């Protein structure tokens, strides 16, 4: 067999045009359904649930809301309830029962401006401790919410007095390997990456990567921090080895410039934490594998342990659209099944083959 065929292939299985701008698509856990979130041209928000049936997409339900919906997560819900938490253009955090979506089961005015990003942990059997939701907004704040607590966040991470407010573009939970430890990573428009330790209520680490940070994700939320990928505006992404933190040098990292345009998102494969996909502004997807170095840490000149970065290998890439792919989500249940949505107002179901051989 030729080498090209032995590599994973990214196959566009189903494509569907939509009559609205779609910002996020998420698989509904334990199902062949996914939900798309966005806004109609008339300025209202929309959630559509699609089901894959006989190789086609069937619209199961369409829900219209007063405000455009920017982002969503199932990360803080149980597998039984499967409630969707969303952030909208008005700064509202809502949690919906998609079976009865008329009014939210939890609602709070979370931010003064648009909620750009949302993540959840402690639900779906992923991560120990209480289910929590984190939101990041244009108002410069990052807040952690517990849906059992009305109106006020559990944690509010905001700039100190006199510090300029930066637009927060992306948030992610990690390090939730027991019921005390938990971290939030946030990325900002000026290139800042900040790692907040929720156990000690402190800023554990910060770094500037010089370009706006579009997406951050830990390779797993529910383990002792292992790796973090951050993507940016100029087509560059960084992989940080989070196992060893040097007091002054921080975490070791490797960077790669793959796309010629903004990398909108990164998503790790749920079944293999060393494989991840990046989604680009020119409508392309790149599939990567991280290779660990022979030794992940070494003693520096000051006799203090420091991390050693590995390398990244490009497994496959494909161009699906002329417009940015703004959202990407792997199926947690079926390896290689993936949904992505683009600013060409369409949603695509992809199949990535041979992932068990990489």
Curated annotation (Swiss-Prot):
This protein's name: Dynein axonemal assembly factor 10
GO biological process terms, semicolon-separated: apoptotic process; axonemal dynein complex assembly
Annotated source species: Danio rerio
Source species, domain of life: Eukaryota
SUPFAM superfamilies: WD40 repeat-like
Keyword Transmembrane included in the entry's annotation: no
GO molecular function: ubiquitin binding
UniProt subunit comment: Interacts with PIH1D1; the interaction associates DNAAF10 with the R2TP complex. Interacts with several dynein axonemal assembly factors.
């Amino acid at each position: 067999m030729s080498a090209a065929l032995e590599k994973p292939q990214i196959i566009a299985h189903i494509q569907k045009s939509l009559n609205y701008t779609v910002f996020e698509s998420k698989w509904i856990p334990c199902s062949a359904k996914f939900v798309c979130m966005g806004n109609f041209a008339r300025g209202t928000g929309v959630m559509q649930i699609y089901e894959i049936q006989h190789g086609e997409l069937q619209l199961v339900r369409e829900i219209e809301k007063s405000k455009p919906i920017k982002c969503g997560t199932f990360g803080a819900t149980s597998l039984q309830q499967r409630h969707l938490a969303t952030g909208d253009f008005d700064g509202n955090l809502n949690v919906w029962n998609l079976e009865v979506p008329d009014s939210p089961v939890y609602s709070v005015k979370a931010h003064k401006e648009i909620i750009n990003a949302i993540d959840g942990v402690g639900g779906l059997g992923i991560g120990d401790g209480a289910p929590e939701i984190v939101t990041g907004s244009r108002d410069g704040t990052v807040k952690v919410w517990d849906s059992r607590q009305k109106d006020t966040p559990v944690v509010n991470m905001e700039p100190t007095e006199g510090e300029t407010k930066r637009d927060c573009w992306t948030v992610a939970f990690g390090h939730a390997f027991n019921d005390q430890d938990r971290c939030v990573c946030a990325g900002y428009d000026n290139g800042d990456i900040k790692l907040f330790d929720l156990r000690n209520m402190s800023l554990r680490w910060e770094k500037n990567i010089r370009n706006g940070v579009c997406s951050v994700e830990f390779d797993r939320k529910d383990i002792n921090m292992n790796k973090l990928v951050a993507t940016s505006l100029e087509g560059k992404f960084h992989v940080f080895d989070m196992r060893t933190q040097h007091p002054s040098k921080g975490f070791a990292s490797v960077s790669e410039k793959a796309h010629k345009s903004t990398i909108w998102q990164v998503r790790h494969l749920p079944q293999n934490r060393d494989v991840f996909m990046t989604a680009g502004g020119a409508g392309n997807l790149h599939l990567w594998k991280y290779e660990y170095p022979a030794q992940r840490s070494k003693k520096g000149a000051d006799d203090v342990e420091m991390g050693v970065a590995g390398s990244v290998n490009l497994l496959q890439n494909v161009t699906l659209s002329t417009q940015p792919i703004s959202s990407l989500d792997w199926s947690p249940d079926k390896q290689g099944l993936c949904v992505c949505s683009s600013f060409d107002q369409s949603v695509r179901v992809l199949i990535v083959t041979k992932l068990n051989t990489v």
